[in-house]
Amino acid sequence: MLTIIIPSIELYDEGKEEFIQTKPQELRLEHSLVSVSKWESRWHKPFLSKDDKSIEETIDYIRCMTLTQNVPPIAYTRITNGNLEEISNYIGSPMTATTFHDKSKTINREIITSEVIYYWMIALSIPFECQKWHLNRLLTLINVCNIKNQPAKKMNKKEITNRNRSLNAARKQALNTRG
């Protein structure tokens, strides 16, 4: 979870003809499957696409991420560039120590929506409570489950020969024989 503070600003009230000072607003945010699902239901397009989001779409996603109750709508208009950078860094953070070293990285052109991720969760028996996790952590868990569920990779002839050679050498040394 990320907590940001939207700073106070001074506004002019034309009706009363006076300046008023707004209060700082604390927002607790969570980049999760739940927030992505809310955003996609409003905008009718995939959140996880390569397309850039408009400022309106970005601010609305921040609304979808918000866990803080009763936030006045005007607070979202006061979000600073510093707040946006902090949120962007939080969204991009892996939130896990797990890394992948897949040499045969293929580009998947499948459009990923929240429903596709929910399908993956069901197919892999991942509990629905994980929908509230940071999205990158959930996607890492899905990737780990996919890797662990794959059958063991078959060795080619060269790998088998090298393995047998090292096993034979270890046996010769353990039994003090020449072969």
Language-model features, listed with the residues they occupy:
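An amphipathic, hydrophobic-aromatic interaction surface with interspersed Lys/Arg
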Residues: 1-43, 47, 67-154
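Short, hydrophobic/proline-enriched secondary-structure or compact coil segments at domain edges
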Residues: 56-68
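Alpha-helical oligomerization segments
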Residues: 142-179
